[in-house]
């Protein structure tokens, strides 16, 4: 472990745990959306339907960004309870060590997820050169940031610096790869809608995260837990309760602000969810009606 303090400083194990938690929303949301849209986008490009491919990419980027800002807000608002809930074997001190690099990684969750879609768009054009150039530039920036931070930061922050340098490198270099992709799509990539949606989601996510961070210590004390490196204590059930309460708060604030700012993607999501609920309700009603009729007929015969 960095700094020679095996138990007081976050090291490789803390980073690996943090990365495992960080990658969960990326794997579930970003990878799923990319897997679904890539064949459709590739087919559209091969058939020279660039407008359809552009629409698919824009919609996917906006949907992914909307989800990733939410997960970023939720996870940053309650890192210690979240770590304790997902890794029950760790104590509060260990959860605090994991929380540092976890927050550092979460800073770059949105651009990291967006790059997966951008990368597949290049692959749809059978272009492997542009993603390679981006990866080279991203790694160079990450290395520069990391070496600079290690030069000035004390050892106990080195693991956090590794995570932050990864996130900041994506944030710094992503506009360039987005510009390269824009050229691929003939100079138009629906950039205005994508940027506006991300700005609104950033505002909503920041406000929701701030509310969660404010309530976190209050809820922690309410359930009888304590977050401290020295004498902290938190059971698994307490962490679950804290996560549940804060998730409800962050979700309510995030959804409310998206609704107030009239984010199109959020409105479409609500409409889709309502339609599915109505469809399930009507299906359940149609299934129960014949059964009720048979029961009434049997009672009449008796």
Feature names for model-found ranges:
Residues 1-302:
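Membrane-embedded alpha-helical bundles of multi-pass transporters/translocases
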